[in-house]
From Swiss-Prot:
A Pfam family hit: Oxidored_q6
Gene label: nuoB
Annotated binding of [4Fe-4S] cluster, by residue: 45-46, 111, 141
InterPro entries assigned to the protein according to its UniProt record, in alphabetical order: NADH_UbQ_OxRdtase-like_20kDa, NADH_UQ_OxRdtase_20Kd_su
Reaction equations catalysed: a quinone + NADH + 5 H(+)(in) = a quinol + NAD(+) + 4 H(+)(out)
Keyword Iron-sulfur appears in the UniProt entry: yes
Listed name of the protein: NADH-quinone oxidoreductase subunit B
HAMAP family referenced in this protein's UniProt entry, alphabetically: NDH1_NuoB
Function of the protein: NDH-1 shuttles electrons from NADH, via FMN and iron-sulfur (Fe-S) centers, to quinones in the respiratory chain. The immediate electron acceptor for the enzyme in this species is believed to be a menaquinone. Couples the redox reaction to proton translocation (for every two electrons transferred, four hydrogen ions are translocated across the cytoplasmic membrane), and thus conserves the redox energy in a proton gradient.
Amino acid sequence: MEVNFKQDKEIQEQIEKNIILTKLDDTLNYFRAHSFWPLTFGLACCAIEMMAAGGARYDIARFGYEVFRASPRQADLMIVAGTITEKMAPIVKKIYDQMPEPKWVIAMGSCATSGGPFVDSYNVVPGADTFLPVDVYIPGCPPRPEALIHGLLTLKEKIIHPKEVGRSE
């Protein structure tokens, strides 16, 4: 029996042109990336810039991220904005643990990413990544609303293309 490779190749080309093949995870990640449910966790001045991002000038709603949740059980994205103290760290971790999977974390501002100007203080945690798996870091003191929007779009790309960018654990 002779196998016709030319015919198999033609069939393969027709399938690629006319049938959309994807994995369920890829489809879910696409929709997850376009509909974050952020949990606001403003601990200092960065929270004011986070609120400004929701205002008319920056309009975070155009990306579909405007519905900030007050409950961790309804959120899939935690934006840690501000100084985290040793006393506050277990509470932040507990709130993170209450969020449903999949969940992501953005560390917004110098204090949340590395402790900021207070890093040498006796009670300041040197960054949220010491006890949380941070996905995106937004530098600045405080970072501008444009930086928050850029961080959200960066997280969106990480979710859509996880193998190309990777996820920190």
